[in-house]
From Swiss-Prot:
GO terms for molecular function: protein homodimerization activity. InterPro entries: Tropomyosin (IPR000533). SUPFAM superfamilies: Tropomyosin (SSF57997). The molecule is in a coiled coil structure that is formed by 2 polypeptide chains. The sequence exhibits a prominent seven-residues periodicity. The lineage of its organism: Eukaryota, Metazoa, Ecdysozoa, Arthropoda, Crustacea. Pfam families: Tropomyosin. This is Tropomyosin. The modification N-acetylmethionine is found at M1. Expressed in leg muscle and chest protection muscle (at protein level). It comes from the Eukaryota. It comes from Chionoecetes opilio. Tropomyosin, in association with the troponin complex, plays a central role in the calcium dependent regulation of muscle contraction.
Length: 284
């Protein structure tokens, strides 16, 4: 009987141990299932993250390709802008050279005009001398005739110089018109270049690559354009000054022309008087 009780107790203990072990295994199984589910969720989450990363990578590559293409286009635009700036510098240099030549011609015309004015003054002096001379003897008449010939020569020389001055003034006016046209063309080109550079600058602001360098180059171009605009304004001011000088010279030429006409009329009267005097002397 004791053996049976001991055996029953041993079996009960074995049963309890088996139950405990079963509970432990069941708990471990549940935990394993939970870990498996958690692992599967993590795998699915990682797959989603991997897909998102791949999508973001594709998008980033597309953006990089687009940015690279835009950067290449902007580099081409900058190269073209640099070419335009160089061409504009050359045009301004040519304009300044044309203005310098115009100023030289204007100075020459001024000198010629001064010579013509001096000749007219000399003619007036000779006329007064002729009027004050006595026509009483043949010797004085000969001297008067020689002086009259000299006065006529001076008048003809003044006419020739006046024609030369008029021709030079016409050339100066033509040069000034061409200079003004070039100045207007240069100003229009600057406006176009400023618009192109403004568009390039706005596009470069959207790029994250080389943004600082692009901004610096944009400021440099703006400074260059500002300098070119100032040069054009100075050239236009010089052209306006030259035009005003030409207008003043034209007025002076008109005045001298009127004086020459009057002098010619006076010379004609003196010649008529001399002819009459010669006739009277011949009659004696």
């Amino acid at each position: 009987m004791d053996a049976i009780k001991k055996k029953m107790q041993a079996m009960k203990l074995e049963k309890d141990n088996a139950m405990d072990k079963a509970d432990t295994l069941e708990q471990q199984n549940k935990e394993a299932n939970l870990r498996a589910e958690k692992t599967e969720e993590e795998i699915r989450a990682n797959q989603k993250k991997s897909q998102l990363v791949e999508n973001e990578l594709d998008h980033a590559q597309e953006q990089l390709s687009a940015a690279t293409h835009k950067l290449v286009e902007k580099e081409k635009a900058f190269a073209n802008a640099e070419g335009e700036v160089a061409a504009l510098n050359r045009r301004i240099q040519l304009l300044e050279e044309d203005l310098e030549r115009s100023e030289e011609r204007l100075n020459t015309a001024t000198t010629k005009l001064a010579e013509a004015s001096q000749a007219a003054d000399e003619s007036e002096r000779m006329r007064k001398v002729l009027e004050n001379r006595s026509l009483s003897d043949e010797e004085r008449m000969d001297a008067l005739e020689n002086q009259l010939k000299e006065a006529r020569f001076l008048a003809e020389e003044a006419d020739r110089k006046y024609d030369e001055v008029a021709r030079k003034l016409a050339m100066v006016e033509a040069d000034l018109e061409r200079a003004e046209e070039r100045a207007e063309s240069g100003e229009s080109k600057i406006v176009e270049l400023e618009e192109e550079l403004r568009v390039v600058g706005n596009n470069l602001k959207s790029l994250e690559v080389s943004e600082e360098k692009a901004n610096q180059r944009e400021e440099t171009y703006k400074e260059q354009i500002k300098t070119l605009a100032n040069k054009l304004k100075a050239a236009e001011a010089r052209a306006e000054f030259a035009e005003r000088s030409v207008q003043k010279l034209q007025k002076e030429v008109d005045r001298l022309e009127d004086e020459l006409v009057n002098e010619k009329e006076k010379y004609k009267n003196i010649a008529d008087e001399m002819d009459q005097a010669f006739s009277e002397l011949s009659g004696f």
